């Protein structure tokens, strides 16, 4: 039986070579690694945002639950890389009863899929982008505030 040879690099798809010819000891980033990257992102925020953001729980799962996908009317689980689950600070009151913590969900497989599709960003950059986007929902940030710390803001 003949062995398959690796695909030659294609300059139009530089990420393809990384995907088809990974280093022998490389593995897809784990749930724990993505959570670590999310916490590192929060630690680099300006202090006015960093301190309150440390109270938000970070949860990382491979995929969103079916209920999340249905509630957001998405085509499928790969359409959601992250989700803020909580009450935005702009809607909270000091008299509110805290029933559950605010959570930022990160979804590993959709993040990895987008990372492979983009091919021009690091996994750290992509996770930071998703975390900042979800934090924007929590803080009620303006477009200018988001753009000040997230260069990908569209």
Question: What residue spans do the PLM features occupy?
Answer:
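Short, highly charged C-terminal tails/helix-capping segments
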Residues: 144-154
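Catalytic glutamate of the conserved HExxH
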Residues: 130, 134-138
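Active-site rim/adjacent substrate-binding subdomains
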Residues: 13-126, 138, 142-145
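N-terminal amphipathic/basic-hydrophobic helices that include classical n-h-c signal peptides
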Residues: 1-18
